[in-house]
Amino acid sequence: MSHRDTLFSAPIARLGDWTFDERVAEVFPDMIQRSVPGYSNIISMIGMLAERFVQPNTQVYDLGCSLGAATLSVRRNIRHEHCRIIAVDNSPAMIERCRRHIDAYKAPTPVEVVEGDIRDITIENASMVVLNFTLQFLEPAERQALLDKIYLGLNPGGALVLSEKFSFEDAKVGELLFNMHHDFKRANGYSELEISQKRSMLENVMLTDSVETHKARLRQAGFEHSELWFQCFNFGSLVALKAGVAA
């Protein structure tokens, strides 16, 4: 059962940097619904993409799986036999809860839940890879290498779903969408103190890119096609396609 996020409702003397620890994991479903506009839509539509792209006898990777929402959405929509989902996260608290969530929903497609660094995971025979608000937590210098590895591990006709918080090259647009996002959080019950303290903890950990930067990286990795398929304020999701026909 998810608890309401009140982690930052009182002043914290020494904030430090953001970590996905036990306290965050406990309130994560409430936190992300109230903080990320369009999150539920992205999760459900990842399932729709899985129905289109996942092929028999292949693997799906959910890199930075948190509590397994995307994994469950994918699994509900797989229409083929002999598929496997590999869900990876480096947070022990997230992984523990993810395993419980996955086990609570029975389905034919097996899920392997892995506690580990997504940079160290071998990607092979993949028809679909999901990076759902994960890449932004890697050092910028490490992002291209991960995308390169994903492209190489995808089968022809495979897809990468890349969801992120965006920055904007147009400062005026960036300011508007930043303010709209804060309005969204206020409307969901977060106080100015909560918004400010969480932002302070995230600012050195979550480093955002523009859509243009993401597309440039995807092209460099080898993806022949990529496009923004969902956006709400400064959050959104791209799909990148590897050319070829699935076997």
Curated annotation (Swiss-Prot):
It catalyses: prephenate + S-adenosyl-L-methionine = carboxy-S-adenosyl-L-methionine + 3-phenylpyruvate + H2O. Its EC number is 2.1.3.-. Homodimer. One of its GO terms (molecular function) is S-adenosyl-L-methionine binding. Disruption phenotype: Deletion mutant shows accumulation of 5-methoxyuridine (mo5U34) and 5-hydroxyuridine (ho5U34) in tRNA. PANTHER family: CARBOXY-S-ADENOSYL-L-METHIONINE SYNTHASE (PTHR43861:SF2), TRANS-ACONITATE 2-METHYLTRANSFERASE-RELATED (PTHR43861). Belongs to the class I-like SAM-binding methyltransferase superfamily. Cx-SAM synthase family. GO terms for biological process: tRNA wobble uridine modification. S-adenosyl-L-methionine binds at residues 39, 64-66, 89-90, 117-118, 132, 199. Keywords: S-adenosyl-L-methionine, Transferase. It comes from Salmonella typhimurium (strain LT2 / SGSC1412 / ATCC 700720). Transmembrane segments: none annotated. Pfam families: Methyltransf_25. This is Carboxy-S-adenosyl-L-methionine synthase. It is an enzyme of class 2 (transferase). It comes from the Bacteria. Catalyzes the conversion of S-adenosyl-L-methionine (SAM) to carboxy-S-adenosyl-L-methionine (Cx-SAM).
